[in-house]
Structure formats: structure tokens, C-alpha cells
């Protein structure tokens, strides 16, 4: 842990005061309220500062982990080595004509609201997705029949080497909860959405309808990372879990939601180890009962806690 902190000491002179935080507890930055500490938690306020971090990390071989809103991520209890990069201070959103340009630290919910205010339709599906714009690119986020792939036109990125590059929609390689951003180590900075002119009242009515559906069906009263598993072809993960009799099953403070079986919630100070143990238990139970292998939608990052070596 201390090795990377020492290697990165020169970064303190390259970035504004307050940008770098040592041993930052990541449970403060995830929806599940779990996870160990980051060696270095860096929050750049400009594209140039982000570029400085990436170039330094590449030159000194320091690993970089991007953390968005922490809504679809499990950070392991041992934390994250090297640099954890948060772009939440890059959160500007502008609308011109039928285009909406959003920096990737903005929330996709706020992007949806800004589109509504500009009487632009196409982002209503995102009105309840609790992630950043960048996280939405990474996962090709979607809900209620809509997805990012339908409306994203271009994205400005930084490569792993710290070079700026603009990707067009033909390069996104979107699939179900996959994209070029997850396949390659691009750091997305801003995206341009091409939307359509609409009626504000109709847009708001659609957003209200989706919000009610979400609040009715999802266990929003507990910390969680949303839907844990991808939808198997022709099936629903939640239905398979429910039919396996797993609702209410607990390991430590983690529980399969009684309200929606596709969610695993933190009901009592769960650790990431407990959470992932329950995920594996659900996967094995569903496989044994139905022969279906559930694939996780949630992303797991970081390291496990090292067990002490006994004499």
C-alpha cells in the first residue's frame, strides 16, 4: 500500500491542493456502503489534470482504477492499490439544438432531467439509473426498454497513455451491459447524445411513470448495487432466484431482497466478502435447481483482505 503512495509523491506538486486523498475509505463512495480503502483517491477538476494523472501513472507503472458513482460496483474489503480516479467534479451538462453534451462525472439522472428541461426526448429511460454518465457508457446502461446505445453519438476519451481521442458511435461496440469502454482502458471524459425534440409534459409523464415503477418494485430503502445479475436469454434472473426460494436468505449483513429477488441488499453493515459469498450462493443454488448459470452485472474491483500468516 505505502509503495504506491511513495511513488506518487511528485503528483502532489502537479495537482491542486485537496485533489489527492490518502487511504480514502471507499465505503463512503459506493451505494452498498462497503469496501476497503484506496491507496490514493484522486478527484481532478479538469481534463488536463486527468491527463496529468494518467501520464504519470503510465510512466511510473501505477495501476489506475476508475470509480464512478459506485452504484454498480463492489469494492472488496482489502481496498484498491495504486490510484483510484473519481471524475465526479467533471459534471457539466449543456444542450444545443437536439444535442446534449455531458461530462462523465455528471449523473445520468441529471442528464435525463436536463434533456427534459430542454424539451428533448430519448433519455427518459435513464431518469432512475443511479450512476454517472461515464458509468452508463461503460455498462451500456439501460432500463425499461431504453439503453445508452440508442442515443449516444460520440465520446471524448483519454487513452491509458494519456492521449485525447474522440470515438464515434461506430466504435462503441455496445452489447448487453458491455462496451468498448469496458473492453479497453479508455477514460471517458464527455459524451454527446443525439436526442429528438419532444413535448415537456409528455416527457415528464413518462419519467413519472418509470419512477413509480421503480419505487414500487425495487428495495430502495436499503443500500444495494441494483440488479446483481444479467438477464439470461429468455428468462428473468429475479424470477429464477425467487423460484429457488432464496428471498430473505442472508449471509452476515447481506440479504437477498424480499421485495425484488434480483437485488442483494446491505441490511446490517455487510462486508464485501459477505456480499460476494451470498452472490456465489445464489449462483450455485440457481444452477443446481434450473441448470442456469447467472452472470453478474455488478463489477467487482479491489483486493481481498490478506489473511494473517500463522506460525
Curated annotation (Swiss-Prot):
InterPro entries: FAD-bd_PCMH (IPR016166), FAD-bd_PCMH-like_sf (IPR036318), FAD-bd_PCMH_sub1 (IPR016167), FAD-bd_PCMH_sub2 (IPR016169), MurB (IPR003170), MurB_C (IPR011601), MurB_C_sf (IPR036635), Oxid_FAD_bind_N (IPR006094)
Reaction(s) catalysed by this chain's protein: UDP-N-acetyl-alpha-D-muramate + NADP(+) = UDP-N-acetyl-3-O-(1-carboxyvinyl)-alpha-D-glucosamine + NADPH + H(+)
Gene Ontology cellular-component annotations: cytosol
Enzyme class: oxidoreductase
Main location class: cytoplasm
The protein's annotated pathway: Cell wall biogenesis; peptidoglycan biosynthesis
Record's keyword terms, sorted: Cell cycle, Cell division, Cell shape, Cell wall biogenesis/degradation, Cytoplasm, FAD, Flavoprotein, NADP, Oxidoreductase, Peptidoglycan synthesis
Source organism superkingdom: Bacteria
Cofactor names: FAD
Active-site residues from the entry: 177, 227 (proton donor), 297
EC number: 1.3.1.98
A GO MF label: FAD binding
Domain named FAD-binding PCMH-type: residues: 34-198
Gene Ontology biological-process entries: cell division; cell wall organization; peptidoglycan biosynthetic process; regulation of cell shape
Xref: SUPFAM superfamilies: FAD-binding/transporter-associated domain-like, Uridine diphospho-N-Acetylenolpyruvylglucosamine reductase, MurB, C-terminal domain
Subcellular localization(s) per the UniProt record: Cytoplasm
NCBIfam families: murB, PRK13905.1
Its biological purpose: Cell wall formation.
Similarity comment: family membership: Belongs to the MurB family.
Protein's UniProt name: UDP-N-acetylenolpyruvoylglucosamine reductase
Origin species: Shouchella clausii (strain KSM-K16)
Upper lineage: Bacteria, Bacillati, Bacillota, Bacilli, Bacillales
Gene: murB
Amino acid at each position: 500500500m505505502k509503495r504506491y503512495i511513495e511513488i506518487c509523491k511528485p503528483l502532489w506538486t502537479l495537482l491542486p491542493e485537496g485533489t489527492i486523498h490518502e487511504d480514502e475509505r471507499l465505503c463512503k463512495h459506493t451505494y452498498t456502503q462497503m469496501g476497503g480503502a484506496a491507496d490514493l483517491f484522486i478527484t481532478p477538476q479538469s481534463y488536463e489534470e486527468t491527463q496529468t494523472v494518467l501520464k504519470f501513472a503510465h510512466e511510473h507503472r501505477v495501476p489506475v482504477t476508475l470509480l464512478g458513482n459506485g452504484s454498480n460496483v463492489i469494492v472488496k474489503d482489502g481496498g484498491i492499490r495504486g490510484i483510484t480516479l473519481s471524475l465526479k467534479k467533471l459534471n457539466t451538462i449543456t444542450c444545443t439544438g437536439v444535442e446534449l453534451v455531458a461530462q462523465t462525472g455528471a449523473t445520468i439522472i441529471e442528464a435525463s432531467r436536463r434533456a427534459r428541461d430542454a424539451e428533448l426526448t430519448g433519455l427518459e429511460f435513464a431518469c432512475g439509473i443511479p450512476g454517472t454518465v461515464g458509468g452508463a457508457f461503460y455498462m451500456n446502461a439501460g432500463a425499461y426498454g431504453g439503453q445508452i446505445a440508442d442515443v449516444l453519438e460520440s465520446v471524448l476519451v483519454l487513452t491509458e497513455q494519456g492521449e485525447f481521442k474522440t470515438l464515434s458511435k461506430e466504435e462503441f461496440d455496445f452489447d448487453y451491459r458491455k462496451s468498448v469502454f469496458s473492453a479497453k482502458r479508455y477514460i471517458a471524459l464527455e459524451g454527446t447524445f443525439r436526442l429528438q425534440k419532444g413535448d415537456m409534459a409528455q416527457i415528464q409523464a413518462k419519467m413519472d411513470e418509470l419512477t413509480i415503477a421503480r419505487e414500487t418494485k425495487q428495495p430502495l430503502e436499503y443500500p444495494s448495487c441494483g440488479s446483481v445479475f444479467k438477464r439470461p436469454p429468455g428468462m428473468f434472473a429475479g424470477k429464477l432466484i425467487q423460484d429457488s426460494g432464496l428471498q430473505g436468505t442472508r449471509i452476515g449483513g447481506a440479504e437477498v431482497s424480499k421485495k425484488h429477488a434480483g437485488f442483494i441488499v446491505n441490511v446490517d453493515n455487510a462486508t464485501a466478502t459477505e456480499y460476494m459469498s451470498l452472490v456465489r450462493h445464489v449462483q450455485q443454488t440457481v444452477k443446481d435447481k434450473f441448470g442456469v448459470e447467472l452472470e453478474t452485472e455488478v463489477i467487482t474491483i479491489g483486493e481481498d483482505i490478506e489473511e494473517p500468516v500463522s506460525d
